[in-house]
């Protein structure tokens, strides 16, 4: 041993080598806040230190014995009591005497080892030893003698740790620990170097090592006992009784004398290598972070018990040795876990009875506790511990700060290098910048010199001035002229009119003509804005007109017409011009010229082909101006040259729509959106004026145009009408795309005359407004609900996935009922997990089954459910990323007026809430299904049902007989539609099927939850009836609803047409719904067949061409066009000159604003309904007095639900089920609405305004 002391840091886990230091221990301890010894080495004399250390040693042994609960005889150094008590006791006394003698000669007793715990504190129940136990230990006597001799040779009173020279085995172990240390231990090494002890202290520690070798010999004896324990366990498993001697040894081995078998260790990370268990005390429970239960016993295996006690011994030894605790790195690895306790166990736990103490006793107890705590803290010098901890933490913080500063410098260097690389990369290909001259582009839509409003003044015509005048015919283009003379002429009625002799300008030869002031227009634009009905000529841009592939474009020129729309912001300050020949176009003010004279009734000056339409337009512009609402890509029937053709919307410009006709002609044309040439507008006019023809319902297409009305149209009811007396919702409502803001709702259902013979008076009665619901203006102050996002606390997380074949064993056993939860929440409460993955801007959903298998589509989920025989169904899953499965709309329970309006008839309760007043809905008997009344013969015989025999949950639509019924109906009108997109797609209906859906029925051999059974199940969605602010009662969803999900059916009384008319007069018709499936399907077929073009290709080629020369024929007919064709082929027609001038006739084919063909809307003679009887008419579903929750759905022009006809219990086409499906993802708390498909004007004397507030609102329902 060297003469100079060596400094060894106290950090146990660092294991760093010893370095020679020249500093004194006092200076180092003072620099790090440790207590400074007085004098040379210590604060106390050697004798006082020895006596105090003996006390610490005895106290430590007694605490260890008390903690383990051992009743065995203990040797002073943790060894086991031998079988011969006397002999070993004498040896122990000798060792104790020798050790005490050695301690008395030295002021230090305790030494802290760097790899285990305090040497003086050995666990009496320790069954495993260190590496030294594997070697042959020396004899106890020899060890004691060597330790005593070594203790006598100690001359220095300071404490020192062993060096690598004196303990080569320990140094080798320390080096191994250094290799396994993480990089973060450098901080502890820095702190270790700052706190050390003199090297001479290791002598006492050497002496104590001798005692540890004695204990190692005794641990070998414990191993023999362990082997006997193993034999004992084998015998217990075989059912034999253990031997008495072995039982006594086992009981003597245990700390508390009680050993248990077949128990469960409370340590969740237990390796389960031991089969012996002991009762867990509070110290071990706290170590493993387990709550104590008073109602049941808790056990620890012997290995976990020893581990906990060893760590507590290390804590106590470090504290009693007055060493900084923060220099000791205690590893305690515990994984986070959650203990699932049943509610029954919690109820069984009884609260311990509290004993009553008097105030004096309580005060005495508190004083005694305070004194005891203070004594313990003073004994371990707790104040010094706090000071040391502060110093160590500050040193670590300073070290981390220095490390962070170095990291910032390195990061800056790396960033600088990266910037240089970036610059070098992009400098290799320099970009040449070139400054171009400024380019000023004047916006084409910019408003130029919009004149102010004012009175229209027509100055008198002046001689010698330039004007515009008619050329040859009234509808031809007008050209520039000069007035040369005033003349007078006599009109047909005998009145004298002023005429003007004019000369045409820019002509190859002089041409003079006499015209009236009605055929002359001013040369300059008018100085004021023009109003509706003003007679003008306007410049027509011929480039916007296309009349076929082989036809030329009409030349641009001034043509006569009237002002249809004034300048306003909505049309970008342009005039809408209705030209005399039927064309329409928007024209700016600078291209409009005022006609010098016009009749008081301006339509008298208009060409006869457009006179009637313009007269009605001018008279009703401010009252009734219906126009078709459509979007790009939609199709509608449009009249072209006497034929109704399907045309597609190409573009929309305010009140004009650009239509492209299908067929060989394939021409485009701008048409006014209120023109009767458009099918929807023509039908509306027919409904209002033609009372003799029966009217069919509209074709329910998802993107079909509809008519929008204004609120100023009450006066239009003066027209004589004969219409039905009651309003009815159509069960075949058209579908909207609720997600598209520009999408339009379907057109209203067409009206029908009353089959029951009820007719209305020709004179319209007084208008009665039906908007009588109370409107609450202080809606913001009312208590509102809010959406709450729950989490599945009781859910068992999925297992780690291992490759296996899925079976029913993959599922968790669910003990709680799931009936009261929403369909999408059931998997998350049954051991499933729903993960939303994000990849850049794209999201995707992955379900993890209870066995850990990942499922990424509904097809995979369906296969998994079949393999595991799960009670869940495929409609309990959805892969929409934005959908919240556990979101729920919560309200104040105090405003709930009825907890369940179905009175238990539905599986899911339907509450009723009202936070406006205390009113309740009108009384209604709840009915889950339809109820036939007198005269309704509902045939429910199962023998008339077609059935299937599928065994694959009807997943193969090509083999299922029920699916084939649905597929056949769809492919009748759309043969190329893929079979995967027809009908339900894993119990989701994404679009309306006009021809109906046929579900599997009671005769089918498939399972009750097959993929073709949706509507026949009862309500599963959580819905809520509530009072709206302006529309009466409504229905909203409590949870999120995915797109295509089934909501409910519409149930009520089934009525005949006659009963509906009679009941409508008495009780009202607001809950009527037509079962009009047959009419819808038949008209869909008619619309499909009407797309076929049966006209002559030769006639179509020249219809409306610019070479038409007969101005007297304003309605070109088929015979005339054929005649023109023949004469053209024979060469009898005159070729036009190649050089055009203003003199050339620029006449266009006349286009009539009114159609030249009637749109057949009469009842088909071969209708399927006629097969059921001569007077057979659609049946009516009435939910006025009896019905289900479907009666509470309000109307919306942009609904989130659509209606689907489904055949379940009968295949009779007259009696489909009316089912509601979601048209889009509906968030919780949203009101559910559908399109009533009322038609405006079909009920005389009734006006109902729409208050849905949708962007495409029709404004009126009736």
From Swiss-Prot:
Residue ranges of every copy of the Pre-SET domain listed in the record: 946-1018
Domain of life: Eukaryota
Modified residues (Phosphothreonine): 217
Main location as per UniProt: nucleus
Record InterPro entries: DNA-bd_dom_sf, Methyl_CpG_DNA-bd, Post-SET_dom, Pre-SET_dom, SET_dom, SET_dom_sf, SETDB1/2-like_MBD, SETDB_methyltransferase
Catalytic activity, as annotated: L-lysyl(9)-[histone H3] + 3 S-adenosyl-L-methionine = N(6),N(6),N(6)-trimethyl-L-lysyl(9)-[histone H3] + 3 S-adenosyl-L-homocysteine + 3 H(+)
EC number: 2.1.1.355
Region (Disordered): 1-194, 743-764, 1086-1148
Ligand binding (Zn(2+) 4): 1197, 1250, 1252, 1257
Residue span, Tudor domain: 529-602, 629-686
Ranges where the SET domain occurs: 1021-1237
GO biological process, one term: methylation
Coiled-coil features, chain-numbered ranges: 353-420
Basic and acidic residues bias spans: 26-41, 50-61, 81-99, 167-179, 1086-1097
Function noted in UniProt: Histone methyltransferase that specifically trimethylates 'Lys-10' of histone H3 (H3K9me3) in ovary. H3K9me3 represents a specific tag for epigenetic transcriptional repression by recruiting Su(var)205/HP1 to methylated histones. Plays a central role during oogenesis.
Xref: PANTHER family: HISTONE-LYSINE N-METHYLTRANSFERASE EGGLESS (PTHR46024:SF1)
Stated name of the protein: Histone-lysine N-methyltransferase eggless
Organism: Drosophila melanogaster (Fruit fly)
């Amino acid at each position: 041993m060297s003469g100079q002391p060596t400094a060894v840091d106290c950090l146990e886990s660092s294991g760093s080598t010893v370095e020679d230091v020249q500093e004194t221990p006092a200076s180092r301890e003072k620099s790090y806040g440790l207590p400074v010894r007085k004098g040379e080495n210590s604060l106390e004399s050697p004798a006082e230190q020895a006596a105090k250390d003996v006390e610490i040693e005895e106290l430590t042994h007694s605490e260890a014995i008390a903690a383990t609960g051992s009743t065995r005889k203990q040797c002073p150094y943790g060894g086991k009591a031998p079988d011969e008590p006397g002999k070993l006791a004498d040896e122990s006394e000798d060792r104790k005497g020798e050790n005490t003698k050695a301690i008395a000669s030295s002021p230090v007793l305790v030494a802290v080892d760097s790899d285990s715990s305090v040497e003086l504190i050995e666990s009496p129940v320790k069954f495993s030893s260190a590496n030294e136990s594997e070697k042959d230990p020396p004899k106890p006597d020899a060890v004691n003698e060597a330790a005593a001799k070594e203790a006598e040779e100690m001359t220095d009173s300071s404490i020192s740790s062993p060096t690598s020279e004196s303990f080569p085995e320990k140094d080798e172990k320390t080096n191994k620990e250094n290799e396994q240390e993480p990089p973060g231990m450098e901080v502890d090494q820095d702190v270790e170097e700052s706190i050390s002890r003199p090297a001479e202290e290791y002598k006492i520690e050497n002496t104590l090592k001798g005692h540890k070798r004695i204990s190692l010999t005794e641990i070998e004896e414990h191993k023999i006992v362990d082997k006997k324990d193993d034999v004992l366990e084998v015998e217990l498993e075989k059912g034999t009784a253990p031997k008495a001697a072995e039982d006594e040894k086992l009981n003597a081995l245990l700390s508390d004398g009680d050993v248990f078998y077949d128990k469960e260790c409370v340590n969740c990370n237990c390796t389960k290598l031991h089969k012996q268990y002991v009762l867990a005390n509070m110290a071990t429970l706290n170590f493993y972070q387990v709550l104590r239960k008073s109602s049941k016993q808790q056990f620890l295996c012997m290995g976990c018990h020893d581990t906990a006690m060893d760590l507590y011994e290390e804590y106590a030894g470090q504290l009693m040795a007055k060493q900084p605790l923060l220099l000791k790195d205690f590893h305690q690895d515990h994984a986070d876990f959650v203990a699932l306790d049943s509610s029954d166990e919690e109820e069984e736990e009884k609260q311990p009875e509290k004993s009553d103490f008097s105030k004096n006793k309580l005060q005495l107890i508190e004083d005694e506790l305070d004194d005891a705590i203070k004594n313990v803290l003073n004994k371990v010098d707790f104040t010094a511990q706090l000071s040391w901890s502060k110093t160590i933490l500050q040193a670590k913080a300073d070290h981390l700060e220095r490390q962070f500063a170095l990291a910032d410098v390195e990061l800056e260097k790396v960033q600088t290098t990266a910037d240089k690389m970036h610059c070098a990369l992009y400098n290799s290909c320099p970009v040449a910048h070139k400054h171009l001259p400024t380019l000023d582009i004047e916006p084409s839509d910019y408003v130029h010199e919009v004149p102010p409003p004012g009175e229209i003044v027509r100055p008198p015509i002046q001689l010698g001035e330039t004007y515009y005048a008619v050329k040859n015919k009234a509808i031809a283009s007008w050209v520039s002229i000069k007035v040369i003379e005033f003349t007078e002429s006599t009109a047909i009625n005998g009145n004298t009119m002023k005429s003007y002799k004019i000369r045409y300008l820019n002509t190859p030869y002089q041409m003079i003509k006499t015209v009236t002031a009605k055929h002359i227009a001013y040369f300059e634009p008018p100085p004021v804005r023009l109003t509706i009905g003003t007679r003008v000529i306007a410049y027509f841009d011929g480039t916007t007109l296309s009349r076929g592939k082989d036809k030329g474009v009409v030349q641009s020129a001034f043509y006569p017409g009237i002002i249809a729309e004034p300048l306003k912001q909505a049309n970008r300050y342009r005039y809408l011009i209705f030209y005399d020949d039927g064309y329409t176009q928007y024209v700016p003010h600078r291209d409009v010229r005022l006609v010098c004279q016009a009749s008081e009734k301006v339509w008298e000056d208009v060409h006869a082909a457009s006179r009637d339409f313009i007269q009605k337009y001018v008279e009703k512009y401010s009252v009734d101006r219906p126009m078709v609402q459509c979007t790009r890509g939609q199709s509608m029937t449009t009249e072209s040259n006497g034929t109704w053709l399907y045309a597609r919307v190409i573009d929309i410009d305010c009140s004009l729509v650009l239509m492209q006709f299908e067929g060989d002609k394939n021409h485009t044309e701008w048409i006014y959106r209120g023109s009767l040439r458009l099918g929807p507008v023509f039908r509306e006019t027919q409904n209002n004026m033609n009372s003799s023809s029966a009217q069919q319902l509209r074709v329910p297409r998802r993107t079909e145009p509809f008519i929008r009305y204004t609120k100023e149209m009450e006066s239009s009811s003066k027209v004589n009408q004969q219409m039905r007396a009651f309003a009815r919702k159509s069960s075949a409502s058209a579908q909207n795309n609720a997600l598209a803001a520009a999408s339009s709702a379907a057109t209203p259902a067409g009206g029908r005359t009353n089959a029951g013979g009820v007719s209305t008076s020709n004179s319209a009665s007084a208008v009665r407004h039906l908007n009588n619901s109370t409107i609450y203006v202080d809606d913001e102050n009312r208590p509102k609900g809010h959406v709450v996002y729950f989490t599945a606390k009781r859910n068992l997380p999925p297992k780690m996935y291992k490759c296996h074949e899925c079976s029913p064993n993959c599922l968790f056993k669910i003990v709680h009922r799931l009936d009261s939860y929403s369909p999408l929440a059931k998997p998350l409460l049954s051991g499933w997990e729903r993960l939303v993955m994000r990849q850049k801007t794209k999201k995707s959903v992955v379900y993890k089954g209870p066995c850990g298998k990942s499922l990424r589509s509904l097809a995979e989920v369906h296969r998994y459910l079949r393999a595991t025989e799960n009670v869940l169904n495929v409609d309990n899953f959805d892969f929409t990323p934005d959908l919240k499965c556990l979101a729920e709309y919560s309200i104040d329970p105090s405003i709930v007026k009825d907890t369940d309006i179905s009175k238990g008839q539905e599986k899911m309760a339907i509450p009723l809430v009202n936070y406006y007043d205390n009113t309740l809905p009108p009384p209604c008997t709840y009915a889950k299904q339809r109820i036939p009344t007198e005269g309704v013969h509902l045939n429910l015989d199962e023998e008339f049902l077609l059935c299937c025999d599928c065994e694959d949950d009807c997943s193969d639509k090509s083999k299922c007989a029920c699916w084939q019924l649905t597929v056949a109906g769809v492919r009748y009108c759309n043969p190329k539609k893929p079979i995967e997109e027809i009908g339900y797609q894993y119990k989701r209906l994404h679009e309306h099927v006009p021809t109906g859906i046929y579900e599997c029925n009671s005769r089918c051999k498939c399972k009750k939850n097959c993929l073709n059974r949706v509507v026949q199940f009862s309500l599963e969605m959580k819905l809520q009836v509530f009072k709206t602010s302006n529309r009466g009662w409504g229905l909203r969803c409590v949870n999120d609803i995915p797109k295509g999900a089934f909501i409910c059916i519409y149930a009520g009384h089934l009525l005949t047409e006659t009963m509906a008319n009679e009941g409508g007069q008495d009780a009202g018709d607001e809950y009527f719904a037509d079962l009009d499936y047959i009419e819808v399907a038949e008209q869909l077929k008619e619309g499909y067949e009407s797309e076929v073009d049966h006209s002559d290709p030769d006639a179509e080629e020249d219809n409306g061409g610019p070479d038409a020369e007969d101005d007297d024929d304003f309605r070109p007919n088929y015979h005339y066009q054929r005649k023109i064709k023949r004469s053209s082929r024979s060469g009898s027609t005159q070729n036009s000159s190649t050089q055009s001038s203003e003199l050339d006739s620029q006449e266009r084919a006349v286009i009539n604003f009114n159609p030249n063909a009637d749109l057949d809307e009469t009842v088909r003679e071969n209708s399927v309904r006629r097969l059921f009887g001569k007077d057979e008419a659609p049946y009516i579903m009435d939910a006025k007095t009896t019905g289900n929750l479907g009666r509470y759905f309000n109307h919306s022009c942009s609904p989130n639900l659509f209606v689907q006809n489904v055949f379940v219990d009968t295949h009779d086409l007259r009696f489909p089920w009316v089912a509601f499906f979601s048209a889009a993802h509906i968030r919780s708390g949203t009101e559910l609405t559908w399109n009533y498909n009322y038609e405006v004007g079909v009920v005389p004397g009734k006006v109902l305004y729409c208050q849905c507030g949708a962007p495409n609102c029709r404004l009126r329902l009736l």
